């Protein structure tokens, strides 16, 4: 389940986004008996407007947006899933978006999977390309319509405050061949990715319903990992 579900058009109408963030906070308290940290709330306040603006400017007001979508059998949450219909095939189509506010990042000890970020000291973080690829793989493994290729699934790491130069090392990750990493420098590219996956003239409610109501069918390896 997502902490907040809304059409892109409705999400844009919430600007300023205080009420949306308040709803997400209430849902988290209701479902998990805990409040998001101040840092997480600040993250929502900075990233949700950027995503909403780009969806609006891309002409995708009919798309359905799932914010903080929880993955099955884990507490991990996907920042956003944009749901709709693929413009070429007519099949359900989903864009998993990992939103980052970082302005710069570099590899940690030449390891493409780990990065250092300004303001976090020497505490390495996972490369967002690896993160979004893992989310897509996990989601597909638990969702038959995705694993059986009845629907489209694409992942994007969107560093909307960064420049290409400031995060150039991150593209050395092998997942750069299959996942997208987009910075604020390439906002047009991000919108083009969205338009290539989501039909602007079709409402995304059906695709979102299909994903949210899908039967969870975890593979044996994932069950073993969860048990461990």
Region spans (language model):
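Accessory nucleic-acid engagement/destabilization modules that flank
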Residues: 1-212
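Conserved adenine-nucleotide phosphate-binding loops and their immediately adjacent elements
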Residues: 215-228
